[in-house]
């Protein structure tokens, strides 16, 4: 799906995003994102509670991170500052009115993250809106390490989200989902 090897049902986008951070980070590290991103501001402080990480803000244009700003943040890293391990983007960007990050820009960001040994996570709660608007196949799996999308946003389902990634990433994610109470054993067919 979307070019990823594997996927995992999770009860919410918040759970999918947080499981991604648990996989991609170690305690004390930083995640680059926008000041007004959902993963930073609207997930009840879950990242600091579960992963014990913090966020580093970069400038953006309607959700599209400024690559030059990311480069400068990476170059400012030092022994005295937390290690930056992950970049988290949101497509579409809710706080910017649902604006779309062009897929070509995601490819450029991916090239940068890979060359700097960083993980790239997409909070794609509304990713189907972006794919339809851009009229693209959007092979996110080729360019991103993980992606979460919501079944109720754009697809009309009553509950749940999917977390996508590599087979190893999803195997680890399945364990994290169980540890934080997301197995939903009695409410759904075994997933």
Question: Residue locations for each model-derived region?
Answer:
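Active-site PLP attachment segment
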Residues: 47, 141-171
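Conserved beta-loop-alpha segment that forms the PLP phosphate-binding cup at the N-terminus of a helix
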Residues: 4-31, 40-44
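Active-site pre-lysine segment of PLP-dependent enzymes
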Residues: 100-111, 115, 126-146
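General beta-strand structural signal in soluble alpha/beta enzymes
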Residues: 8-11, 33-34, 57, 88-89, ...
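Conserved small/polar residues in nucleotide/adenosyl-binding loops
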Residues: 189-191
């Amino acid at each position: 799906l979307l070019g990823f090897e594997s996927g995992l049902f999770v009860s919410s986008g918040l759970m999918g995003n947080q499981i991604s951070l648990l996989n991609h980070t170690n305690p004390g590290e930083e995640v680059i994102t926008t000041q007004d991103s959902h993963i930073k501001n609207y997930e009840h402080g879950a990242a600091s509670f579960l992963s014990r990480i913090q966020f580093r803000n970069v400038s953006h244009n309607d959700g599209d991170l400024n690559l030059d700003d990311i480069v400068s943040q990476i170059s400012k890293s030092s022994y005295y500052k937390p290690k930056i391990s992950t970049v988290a983007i949101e497509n579409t960007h809710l706080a910017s009115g649902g604006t779309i990050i062009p897929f070509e820009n995601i490819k450029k960001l991916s090239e940068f993250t890979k060359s700097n040994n960083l993980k790239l996570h997409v909070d794609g709660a509304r990713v189907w809106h972006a794919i339809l608007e851009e009229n693209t196949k959007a092979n996110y799996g080729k360019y991103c390490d993980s992606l979460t999308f919501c079944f109720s946003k754009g697809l009309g389902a009553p509950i749940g989200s999917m977390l996508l990634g590599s087979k190893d990433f999803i195997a680890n994610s399945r364990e994290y989902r169980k540890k934080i109470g997301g197995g939903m054993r009695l409410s759904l067919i075994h997933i």
